[in-house]
Design a protein with these regions (language model features):
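Flexible domain-boundary/linker segments
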Residues: 38, 42, 72, 83, ...
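Short basic helix-loop element that most often maps to the first helix and adjoining turn
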Residues: 14, 19-58
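Short amphipathic recognition helices of helix-turn-helix/homeodomain-type DNA-binding modules
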Residues: 3-27, 77-83, 87-106
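Detector for methionine-enriched segments
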Residues: 1-4, 57
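Recognition helix of helix-turn-helix/homeodomain-like DNA-binding domains
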Residues: 42-46, 52-53, 59-76, 86
Length: 106
């Protein structure tokens, strides 16, 4: 289980960093095997890895909210939300740190 890195500051996240955050989240999502995570195999998948809906469910956040985060929209996730997303995406401690940096919370 991933733990929260020490919070240093909250800053406004520039556009390019939000885009990098979105690209990072998408890459992690696409790299995961749904069956390995215990998710049922339901029909044919149009995209590799997890669906956004599955990540949102595993992270205990709303689908729309997770989608906006992955799309690089201007949202302000809390530390708890980022930890949930990091756990859902099975991020390493280094990847979790990167997630916090890209979200402007480290």
């Amino acid at each position: 289980m991933t733990t929260m890195p020490q919070r240093e500051s909250t800053i406004a996240v520039p556009d390019d960093r939000r885009k990098q955050l979105g690209a990072f989240l998408r890459a992690r999502r696409e790299s995961l095997d749904p069956q390995r995570l215990g998710l049922p195999r339901v029909g044919r998948r149009r995209t590799p890895g997890l669906r956004r809906e599955e990540v949102a469910m595993l992270a205990d956040v709303g689908v729309t909210w997770y989608t906006w985060l992955e799309q690089g929209r201007e949202v302000n996730p809390s530390e708890a939300v980022l930890v949930g997303v990091a756990n859902a995406l099975q991020c390493s401690p280094l990847e979790t740190r990167l997630l916090f940096v890209l979200a402007g919370l480290a």
